[in-house]
């Protein structure tokens, strides 16, 4: 039974696979997704900090937090959702935790995350 379920999940992942950039919690993301309203369908952009990432096969998801008009908004997106159009990494963040739920309580400068810098090693002659 579980083997059949695993095969089904693998088929669905292959069918719904999208090109997704590599990102981690702490990164600034720009998520584009479709919203269905009473008037029709429109595209919305949600830009904020990734506070968690959950890798569970077909049920993989990630949470993004942004501050709008002084209120903290956390939105969860499913990786294999047909409503998800694209994800862009705007900035890499330097954090030492996998889940950044403590950021939901912080505002302003306290909620800032340092940028992760990568260095290129020069070849010696």
From Swiss-Prot:
Entry keyword annotation includes Ribonucleoprotein: yes
Annotated SUPFAM superfamilies: Translation proteins SH3-like domain
UniProt keywords, alphabetically: Ribonucleoprotein, Ribosomal protein
Gene3D superfamilies listed in its UniProt record: 2.30.30.790
InterPro entries, A to Z: Ribosomal_bL19, Ribosomal_bL19_sf, Translation_prot_SH3-like_sf
GO cellular component: cytosolic large ribosomal subunit
Gene Ontology terms for molecular function: structural constituent of ribosome
Residue spans crossing the bilayer: none
Example GO BP: translation
Record's keyword annotation contains Repeat: no
Similarity comment: Belongs to the bacterial ribosomal protein bL19 family.
Function description: This protein is located at the 30S-50S ribosomal subunit interface and may play a role in the structure and function of the aminoacyl-tRNA binding site.
This protein's name: Large ribosomal subunit protein bL19
Species of provenance: Wolbachia pipientis subsp. Culex pipiens (strain wPip)
Annotated gene: rplS
């Amino acid at each position: 039974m579980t083997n059949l379920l695993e095969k089904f999940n693998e088929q669905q992942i292959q069918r719904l696979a999208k090109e997704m950039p590599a990102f981690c919690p702490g990164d600034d993301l720009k998520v584009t997704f479709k919203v269905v309203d009473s008037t029709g369908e429109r595209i919305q952009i949600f830009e904020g900090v990734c506070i968690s990432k959950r890798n569970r096969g077909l049920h993989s998801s990630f949470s993004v937090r942004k501050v709008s008009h002084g209120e903290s908004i956390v939105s969860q997106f499913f990786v294999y959702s047909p409503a998800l159009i694209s994800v862009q990494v705007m900035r890499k963040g330097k954090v030492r935790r996998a889940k950044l739920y403590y950021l939901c309580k912080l505002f302003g400068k306290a909620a800032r995350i340092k940028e992760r810098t990568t260095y290129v090693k020069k070849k010696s002659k």
